């Protein structure tokens, strides 16, 4: 029998085991440029391990997912973090799992608002980008360099996500 996954709102507390939520947090705000700019400082830390590795900035264009959606795989990046920040201002789904002896456990699903991003720490199991509703662009900060920075796991039985209420 298929297992359905509940969708929860994305909060810093709920996501803390997997990385950081990237959003305008008043606690991190400081005024710069003569008081004309609010800087929300150090919301996440990019990681790039390995000889010659570097942090790069990318633009990803995600196609919207159809629902119900089968979560049949997860991936992780052993040498670097990966962050996703929506440029299009559209909500998206974030699917993560705790590690259970080298494989992903039962996935957890979060609904990110269009003004929230996420930073997955190194080795965090997550599903690839899940845009909602329409084609959406994301600013992605991750690692470039030698070595295999992608590990994938395929579930024998997929988990199912029902269509989120937006």
From Swiss-Prot:
Gene Ontology biological process terms, A to Z: allantoin catabolic process; purine nucleobase catabolic process
EC number(s) stated in the UniProt entry for this protein: 4.3.2.3
Enzyme class: lyase
Pathway assigned to this chain's UniProt record: Nitrogen metabolism; (S)-allantoin degradation
Transmembrane domains' residue ranges: none
InterPro entries tied to this protein: RmlC_Cupin_sf, UAH_cupin, Ureidogly_lyase, Ureidogly_lyase_bac, Ureidoglycolate_lyase_dom_sf
GO MF annotation terms: ureidoglycolate hydrolase activity; ureidoglycolate lyase activity
Highest rank taxon of the organism: Bacteria
Swiss-Prot/TrEMBL catalytic activity: (S)-ureidoglycolate = urea + glyoxylate
Database matches in NCBIfam families: PRK03606.2-2, PRK13395.1
Record-stated family: Belongs to the ureidoglycolate lyase family.
Protein name: Ureidoglycolate lyase
Gene source species: Rhizobium leguminosarum bv. trifolii (strain WSM2304)
Gene designation: allA
């Amino acid at each position: 029998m298929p297992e359905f996954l509940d969708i929860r709102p994305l909060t810093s507390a709920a996501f803390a085991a997997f990385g950081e939520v990237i959003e305008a947090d008043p606690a991190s705000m400081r005024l710069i440029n003569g008081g004309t700019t609010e800087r929300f400082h150090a919301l996440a830390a990019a990681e790039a391990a390995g000889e010659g590795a570097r942090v790069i900035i990318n633009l990803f264009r995600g196609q919207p997912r159809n629902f119900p959606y089968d979560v049949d795989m997860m991936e992780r990046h052993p040498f670097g973090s990966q962050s996703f920040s929506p440029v299009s201002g559209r909500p998206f789904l974030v699917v993560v799992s705790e590690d259970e002896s080298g494989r992903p456990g039962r996935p957890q699903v979060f609904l990110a608002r269009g003004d929230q991003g996420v930073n997955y720490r190194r080795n965090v199991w997550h599903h690839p980008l899940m845009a909602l509703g329409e084609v959406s662009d994301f600013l992605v900060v991750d690692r470039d360099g030698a070595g295999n920075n992608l590990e994938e796991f395929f579930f024998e039985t997929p988990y199912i996500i029902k269509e989120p209420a937006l």
